[in-house]
């Protein structure tokens, strides 16, 4: 299977706080604005499956709100800890809109965040 591009939001409407969490094609996606542009990553810490969108984006990284694990928004690489890297998603601006490319298959258990009260994938 491949990937499919999905419209997310008009670039002009992107939140001023620099981040937006969305469910796209079954994937939990975090789009963040850094000094280098917009980037999209799986909205799930690889350490304990927390939603990274509840954390802060600073200096090109997103920090997990649970234990402070940091991930590079552009590459998904975990910085300063021995946790697995994040999945990244291709992002493009088309006719003023932000589009994200996600796999056609939904995420497995190991890539879905833990959300209290939500059913498992």
Can you say where each PLM-predicted feature lies in the sequence?
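Iron-sulfur (Fe-S) cluster-binding segments and ferredoxin-like electron-carrier domains
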Residues: 51-58, 70-80
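Short, basic/low-complexity N-terminal boundary segments at the transition from targeting/disordered tails
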Residues: 1-9, 66-77
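Short cysteine clusters
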Residues: 45, 64-67
């Amino acid at each position: 299977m491949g990937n499919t591009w999905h419209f997310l939001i008009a670039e002009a409407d992107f939140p001023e706080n620099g981040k937006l969490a969305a469910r796209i094609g079954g994937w939990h996606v975090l789009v963040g604005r850094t000094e280098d542009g917009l980037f999209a990553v799986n909205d799930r810490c690889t350490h304990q499956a927390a939603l990274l969108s509840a954390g802060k984006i600073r200096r090109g990284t997103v920090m997990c709100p649970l234990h402070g694990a940091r991930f590079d928004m552009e590459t998904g690489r975990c910085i300063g800890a021995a946790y697995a890297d994040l999945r990244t998603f291709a992002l493009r601006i088309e006719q003023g809109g932000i589009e994200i490319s996600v796999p056609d298959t939904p995420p497995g258990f190991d890539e879905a965040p833990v959300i209290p009260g939500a059913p498992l994938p």
